[in-house]
Amino acid sequence: MHIPHFHLHKGPKGVRTISYEQLLSEDDSYASEKLSEDHVTEVHFVTDKDEDSNASGESRGSMELLENCFSLLHAQDDTSKFVSLTMLAKLLNDHPNLIFKCWERMDMKFLDRLLLSTHYEYVDLGVSILLAFCSEEAILRSYEVKKRVSTLLQCCLKHYDLCIPVICTLSSNPKSAKYLLYYTSFIINEFPFEQAFEILSNALYALDNVQTYMRPIFQGIDKRRGWKLDCTFSFFSDLFSRFPVQSWYSEAIRANLQPLMDAVVERFITDKNLSSATVILSNLLKAAGPASIMPNDGFMILVIGRCSAEIRGSLGMLVKAVGQKGKHGTVSYTVCECYEVLGLLIRYLCENCDVLAQRIEPDKFFQLQRSLTELFSDTMDFLRDAWDNNKNRDNLASHVTVISAVATLCLWLTEDDSQYAQASGLMDIFVYLWRHSWSNGIDYAKWISVALPSMLSNKVFFKAFKDFDAWKVVYDDFIKCNDDLKGDKSFNDYILSTNEEDGEDERLAQAIQDFHILIQLNSLVPQSIWNDDIWQEPYWKNLLESNF
């Protein structure tokens, strides 16, 4: 560990002391350069002499030097304190193991005075000292560092660039990050927004849950009318990308969401770039639901139209890019967020279709449906073209744009039977992605199997499904889910041990979905599969008997 020399220098002879008032005064002309040369020479004489001693003598010498150092540090005059810091820097460079002893005996009041000084040299010295000691995690999490945070933030208001390395160091540990976040209200209300957001982002990212700190942040932005600023959007876009909804949202801030939503509405109306707005909107929708967030049906129609246009305008350039890492990453990210928003709104539309059909004018409702139909027609063309133009299918299947496109497309296909014939042209892709999900943890099986029962009612789609022997992937998935569920126990033992309060296991839900698809495909599947041992499990045996 390297301890900096604290920026002290030799100066002319002649020393005077300095009071606390002088140290903080605007008129203070006492600079670190005015340290006595005699004092500095004495320090070097002592340290040089110590370096020439043997191992035991070196230890004794360093301890003697340490005692001399702290005698000067706690002296009444400030000149002695400055000299002691020169000694301390030299001592810690030679003996870094003494850092904890030095921190325990540090003159904290003097350190605070340095941080609050009106002279840059003193502030620089104080920040350097604090940063050097905070390089040790145990010191970083100490009570004395916690007590310095208020002073550091006051210093940071005047010397932001000087203090930000210490802020970043504090933010590197969850405990010390909380020391900073204790002052969330002060930070968001007193600092320029860009600086406040940088401090808060650094500190928040050290934690797993940030609910506690969201309300004062919302209130501070509201108080200072900062909702429309680009830095505000960047802050929330980054925050929501980093944390899942449950990590930042609580009912306590529901009432504070409206100003942010109003700013999002304005962005959708006026801005060409929807990147930040879609990230924020998707998270607000997941947190509070469309009914609470959407100001009116007109805005919902606007959002669907703009997101659809954003996606359709970008898919062409992404056909080849999805097979090349890093290419058009920003565009892919925006497209994914647009799909995310559309998925949430499609669910809302499906769940409230009758009510919305009565509320929304027929021509606008038709316009909304046409917009989505055209989008997903283009989405299927994109998937077909991307598949045919990229040989590395595993990379393609793992690309965020493909994942988002398939997830939202399958949701839409559960409702729109007019596009089943076109969807039949993706049968090879669906089968591949379903199998791909087994080893890569992507929910393709879940998404495709939800849409499949509806699509199988279409003759064109059913024929394509039959031609690809796609029933095999459904049955293989059913067996795999059962194997995963059983582990070392029998399947029935697993079912009996499942706690209903914990909710249904996703693998069990998938197995049940596969079962119902197999029943629907009874005319396609070989009848011999119904004789497999899996159907002797009481759970499936009962289901099978009730369906035949």
Swiss-Prot record:
Q: Which UniProt keywords apply?
A: Phosphoprotein
**Where, per the database record, does this protein carry Phosphoserine?**
19, 25
Does Nucleotidyltransferase show up as a keyword for this record? no
| Positions of modified residues (Phosphothreonine) | 47
Tell me the first and last residues of the signal peptide.
none
Its recorded name reads: Uncharacterized protein C16C4.02c
Q: Give the top-rank taxon of the lineage listed in the UniProt record for this protein.
A: Eukaryota
Question: Cellular component terms, GO, for this chain's entry?
Answer: cell division site; mitotic spindle pole body; nucleus
Query: Which organism does this sequence originate in?
Result: Schizosaccharomyces pombe (strain 972 / ATCC 24843)
One Pfam family it belongs to? Neurochondrin
